[in-house]
């Protein structure tokens, strides 16, 4: 009897060891299998920072390379200009994501390989522009506003209107993004989206001509049209500008050196963006790309993404790792209400015409 008890005890110990080894090794999906591969990203600035990419490289034994784009038009141009055979993962904004799906430039994502998807904000997952035929083509990553950014050491009273850009006191001290989104801004000043947010993205010829006139009038005030967030950071750091349209990345980066930039929502409103991660249709690394997407939407990694960018992140659970001040600063503590203040970019059906107007403004 004692011997049988010993045999039974030994079997129990061996079973326990096997269970422990299995638990430590994780699920099959978690196992690194991609040694030596390279994953190529085509993203906005800040979306491939070593602070969170390095962890992925180490976990899966791979290398991540990144190419940045400065506008949605540049992203589409790169993809259509041969980039479809170069890049694996891209980060389009909400103004072109649906177009990429419709044009067949991206592949559906197997959400079984992206278990963290279930933890993303429902409001972001419920948007239909990246869904087709019951399949999902884009996973929400970050979101944010196109705010009015100002140097609070120079402008003591927070601006309440975009009209401050035309104030003669700030001639040569304003910066705009080199992008058609400036037309959206003028559309908001014209009150076009009071009852219909999509009106900014479907302006009539007469409305576009009016926007062009306003933007040409603004040109003497403009120090420079910035092409990248880094360029706008430099303009503020060098005190070349005191007002700009920009993203939360800029006050976060510039204020780290002791400056005092702030951002506000003017009374006319603001536009904003939702950035998704998508997989290029011809990517040879789709499985690795899905692992990457799952990794960077993990709640702990999303906290690091917020640290780096200052942007809102898609995984609300990231707030568990933030101070109340950080959660408030990126509006993750009140995401649904804050999002109601933003007119998020939509696809511009006649994008060529918008680009034509913007190019005419710059050529004047």
Where are these regions (language model features)?
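Periplasmic-binding protein-like
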Residues: 209, 214-218, 257-281
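Paired acidic/hydrophobic, glycine-rich loop segments that form the ligand-binding mouth/hinge
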Residues: 87-91, 225, 242-247, 263
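Short, low-complexity disordered leader/linker segments with a strong preference
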Residues: 1-39, 364
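A ligand-binding cleft/hinge motif common to bilobed small-molecule-binding domains
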Residues: 97-99, 245-260
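Extracytoplasmic ligand-binding site segments that recognize negatively charged/polar headgroups
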Residues: 86, 91-97, 101-237
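Conserved C-terminal helix/tail region of periplasmic/extracytoplasmic solute-binding proteins
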Residues: 336-364
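Early extracytoplasmic/lumenal segment of secretory-pathway proteins
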Residues: 30-100
């Amino acid at each position: 009897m004692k011997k049988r008890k010993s045999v039974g005890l030994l079997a129990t110990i061996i079973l326990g060891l096997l269970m422990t080894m299995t638990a430590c090794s994780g699920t099959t999906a978690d196992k690194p299998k991609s040694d030596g591969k390279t994953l190529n990203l085509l993203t906005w600035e800040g979306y491939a920072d070593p602070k969170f990419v390095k962890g992925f490289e180490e976990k899966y034994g791979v290398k991540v390379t990144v190419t940045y784009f400065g506008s949605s038009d540049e992203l589409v141009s790169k993809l259509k200009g041969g980039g479809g055979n170069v890049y694996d993962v891209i980060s389009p904004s909400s103004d072109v994501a649906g177009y990429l799906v419709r044009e067949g430039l991206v592949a559906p994502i197997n959400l079984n390989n992206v278990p963290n998807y279930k933890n993303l904000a429902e409001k972001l997952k419920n948007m239909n522009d990246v869904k087709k035929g019951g399949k999902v083509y884009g996973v929400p990553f970050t979101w944010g506003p196109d705010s009015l950014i100002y140097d609070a050491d120079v402008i003591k009273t927070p601006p309440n209107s975009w009209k401050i850009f035309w104030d003669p006191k700030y001639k040569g001290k304003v910066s705009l993004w080199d992008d058609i989104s400036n037309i959206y801004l003028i559309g908001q000043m014209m009150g076009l989206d009071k009852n219909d947010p999509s009106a900014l993205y479907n302006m009539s010829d007469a409305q576009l001509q009016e926007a062009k006139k306003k933007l040409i009038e603004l040109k003497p005030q403009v120090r420079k049209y910035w092409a990248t967030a880094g360029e706008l950071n430099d303009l503020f750091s060098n005190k070349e500008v005191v007002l700009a349209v920009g993203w939360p990345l800029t006050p976060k980066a510039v204020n780290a050196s002791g400056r005092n930039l702030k951002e506000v929502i003017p009374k006319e409103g603001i536009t904003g963006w939702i950035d998704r991660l998508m997989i290029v249709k011809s990517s040879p690394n789709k499985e690795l790309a899905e692992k990457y997407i799952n990794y960077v939407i993990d709640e702990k990694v999303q906290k690091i993404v917020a640290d780096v960018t200052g942007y809102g992140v898609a995984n609300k659970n990231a707030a568990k790792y933030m101070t109340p001040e950080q959660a408030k600063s990126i509006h993750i503590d009140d995401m649904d209400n804050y999002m109601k203040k933003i007119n998020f970019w939509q696809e511009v059906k006649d994008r060529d015409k918008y680009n034509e107007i913007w190019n005419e403004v710059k050529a004047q």
